[in-house]
Amino acid sequence: MKTLWMVLCALARLWPGALAGCAEAGRCCPGRDPACFARGWRLDRVYGTCFCDQACRLTGDCCFDYDRACPARPCFVGEWSPWSGCAGQCQPTTRVRRRSVRQEPLNGGAPCPPLEERAGCLEYSSSQSQDCGHSFVPAFITSSVFNKKRIIQAVSPQWSTHTKDAGYCMEFKTESLTPHCALVNSPLTRWMQYLREGYTVCVDCQPPAMNSVSLRCSGDGLDSDGNQTLRWQAIGNPRCQGTWKKVRRVEQCSCPDVHRFIFI
């Protein structure tokens, strides 16, 4: 078969236009396009009508020079934009970041990755710079990683210098949770998969989630006797929620990182 192919190629040199293909026709088309064809040798070594569209790989009727004339080019995207502010004030909502396409995929190249990401957030200052957002029940929690990105004075200017380091940790024993916590798989919500029934978790109460007057976090359960069932909800996935009971208050959280969260 290889010898026959070499003979055909040699004969083609004596037959003008026999090796016409995508390059000579100047064609490279997306998807399936019956009008995107040329006359020449196909990759399956049949001479006749051959195609220069993206679907020819599946149908096996590409022109012999398709790979060279129409190389696959993957999608290229730019860098992520900075995170936006919260979409609303004084209530659980979302923030967003986006990136743009620098080059669309061509000729079956790798598709574009997600161009938008959302994450939960809660602002504690209204448009009139009034302290707010502390009256929510149940307790709203998120990953402790988010705590590193909170800027105290920008969110709540009422905090004085000597109270910036105020805070405490609440330990809870998880009683129940919805199955939706284990179904999320984005980088920003993966922490929810570590919530488990019967586990003890730690939740930090830090500014700005801490009320600047009461020095408490909403939903901290500090006043419960330990037998009261309290409710919590994960920021970023409202269907991830459940119940827990207070274990104790401590000054510093000592749980493993995957079982350490913050009030928000």
From Swiss-Prot:
It is found in: Secreted, Extracellular space, Extracellular matrix. Residues 24-75 form the SMB domain. One of its GO terms (cellular component) is extracellular region. Glycans are attached at residue 227. The keyword Transferase does not apply. Disulfide bonds join 28-36, 28-52, 36-70, 50-52, 50-63, 56-62, 63-70. Belongs to the thrombospondin family. This is Somatomedin-B and thrombospondin type-1 domain-containing protein. It comes from Mus musculus. The gene is Sbspon.
